[in-house]
Each structure stands twice: as structure tokens, then as C-alpha cells.
């Protein structure tokens, strides 16, 4: 945690020496930003763009990364409600804003409000991460092992989340369509032959 002025100094110095600068802004709904999803996005977007401009003023060639991280606040406790459906929407919308400007982006995803790697943690993380991946997030941080709204970590969760992330990331891949993957010849052979694909060479090669 740094003072506002010291953070700006770090950003300017990093920019001058050519380090990539990830501009992270954390508007928390109802606390440090408006309580509505749209209002939180407006403010967080403006703050992120301002940070990127500051980096470019220090070095016009620096690689600045759009790192907006709008957050849902649990107004009962003041903590982050990272496992909520609204958090998933905020994350996806922030990624889409970066894409609108054609900026490389980074976001937080995979948070949960559960304090244990249980069923609640599983479905909250899965919803959050799937939306982030499907909307095209370039760099996702805090994606594994975190619990209790990013206030705790779990070694068990790291193992579980690693497996989950592999499955979710595969849903973001484009389907490869070419002569080989369409497998017309293999289909023809199976129809005229054994009636299954288990013995086809393509099954072993492409699995």
C-alpha cells in the first residue's frame, strides 16, 4: 500500500525505463464508486484511462495495460463480495471496455466469498472465471487459491482451481476447422467399415 503521490512516482519511473505498466483501479460499488454497476464502470474506466495517459506522458512508447478491477462491496461488512453474479458482470464489462479501446487488458477473476474450498467456492469461481474467459480477458490474476473475498488462500484450493482453470480455459479456444479436423474421409471409412472410430488412425493422432 502506497500513498497516492508515491504510486504516481512509481508509475512514472517504470514508464520512463520502459517497464510495462499495469494500470489497476479498484472502484468498489457503494464505497469508493457509485453503487450501480453502470456508475462503477464509468468511474473505474475513467480512472484507468487517466492512469494510462499518465504512463504515456512519461514515455509515449510504454506498454500500458488496461487493468480496471471494479468490485462489488458487501455494505454490511465493507468487504468484497467477489463471488456474486454482479461481480461476474462487472469483470466481463471491464474486459469489454478494454476491447472497445483495443487495449491489452488484465482483470481479477475467480474470487469467492466462501472461506473454504467447498461447493460454494466452486460455483462462484466457475461463474466468474467462465465469463472472464469467454469475454476475452488477456491476463487474469488472483485466479487460483483465493478464498473469503481475496482475504485468504488455501493450498487445497490451488490444486482444485488449477484443474478447473484448465477446463475453463479450453472453452475460450476457437474450434479448429480444416480438412483434417472435419474428418470427412474418416467418416466415410467408418460408414463403409467397422461402424466406429476407435480403430481410426485420426482418433489416436488428434485425441
Over which residues does each language-model region extend?
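Single conserved hydrophobic/aromatic residue that forms the stacking wall/gate
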Residues: 1-10, 207
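Glycine-rich anion/phosphate-binding loop at the beta-strand->alpha-helix junction
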Residues: 8-164
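Catalytic-core signal marking the mid-to-C-terminal active-site face
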Residues: 156-206
Amino acid at each position: 500500500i502506497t500513498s497516492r503521490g508515491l504510486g504516481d512516482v512509481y508509475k512514472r519511473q517504470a514508464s520512463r525505463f520502459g517497464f510495462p505498466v499495469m494500470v489497476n483501479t479498484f472502484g468498489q460499488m457503494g464505497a469508493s464508486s457509485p453503487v450501480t454497476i453502470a456508475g462503477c464502470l464509468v468511474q473505474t474506466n475513467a480512472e484507468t484511462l487517466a492512469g494510462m495517459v499518465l504512463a504515456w506522458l512519461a514515455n509515449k512508447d510504454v506498454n500500458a495495460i488496461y487493468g480496471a478491477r471494479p468490485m462489488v462491496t458487501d455494505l454490511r461488512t465493507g468487504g468484497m463480495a467477489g463471488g456474486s453474479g454482479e461481480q461476474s458482470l462487472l469483470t466481463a464489462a471491464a474486459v469489454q471496455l478494454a476491447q472497445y479501446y483495443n487495449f491489452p487488458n488484465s482483470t481479477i477473476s475467480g474470487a469467492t466469498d466462501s472461506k473454504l474450498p467447498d461447493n460454494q467456492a466452486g460455483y462462484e469461481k466457475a461463474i466468474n472465471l467462465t465469463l472472464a474467459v469467454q469475454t476475452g480477458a488477456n491476463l487474469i490474476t488472483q485466479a487460483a487459491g483465493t478464498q473469503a473475498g481475496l482475504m485468504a488462500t488455501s493450498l487445497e484450493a490451488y490444486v482444485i482451481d488449477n484443474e478447473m482453470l484448465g477446463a475453463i480455459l479450453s472453452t475460450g479456444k476457437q474450434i479448429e476447422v480444416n480438412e483434417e479436423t472435419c474428418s470427412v474421409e474418416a467418416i466415410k471409412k467408418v460408414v463403409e467399415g467397422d461402424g466406429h472410430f476407435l480403430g481410426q488412425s485420426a482418433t489416436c493422432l488428434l485425441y
